[in-house]
Amino acid sequence: MVPEYSRLYKILGYSFKNYTLLVRALTHRSKTKKNYERLEFLGDSILGFVIAEVLYMEFPDLAEGKLSQIRSKLVKGVTLANLALNFKLDEYIILGASEQGGHKREKILEDVFEAIIGAIYLDSDFATVKKVIVNWYKPVISTLNLDDVKVKDSKSKLQEILLQNGLSLPEYSIETIDGKDHEQEFTVKALSNDLNIEVRAKGTSRKKAEQKAAEKMIQILSQQGLHEKK
């Protein structure tokens, strides 16, 4: 029997012509090889571009650095997870037995949100998915407090410190992934070849582990007298 998705279509503001794309966007890898991972990859790129364009047009007087900070805030995990919960995507996510209980996990919600975007694009066209994304983000952008968007994330801050001092960017690599799918712990190594500095950090996602590793490297650079130039 075909699942009843009319309620979800109404929430999303989009009705799929090929509902199997939606099913795949909602399916975690623990369930089947035909899962949302490729759609997530596509949706992530589309979302980043659309939000960048919206911010460019909406805030013509903001500098590139500020625009980047705002975009980072709008496309990061917690924002996407909250939007996914608002859309009640957690009620539709398809998980395998090993992932049961993971419907409200931030990483899964974030991935499904991006996969939905990829699925809408393949089901329609770029103009359509852009319109859908803009409608989703209107209330978010309209309530933005630009003064609250001040702090760079650690990776961005580290990048600026290194570039300002004529040094190459660090290399990030995953060393280990431990635990079950819904309780994974990533160990990431950050390496600065120019300075011969190597640090490691753990996190519940690759992104979080990389941010922690970047923060560790910033602390080492600070001890060596390398700081971000204002």
From Swiss-Prot:
Its EC number is 3.1.26.3. Its cofactor is Mg(2+). Keywords: Cytoplasm, Endonuclease, Hydrolase, Magnesium, Metal-binding, mRNA processing, Nuclease, RNA-binding, rRNA processing, rRNA-binding, tRNA processing. Residues 5-125 form the RNase III domain. Its main location: cytoplasm. SMART domains: DSRM (SM00358), RIBOc (SM00535). Digests double-stranded RNA. Involved in the processing of primary rRNA transcript to yield the immediate precursors to the large and small rRNAs (23S and 16S). Processes some mRNAs, and tRNAs when they are encoded in the rRNA operon. Processes pre-crRNA and tracrRNA of type II CRISPR loci if present in the organism. Homodimer. This is Ribonuclease 3.
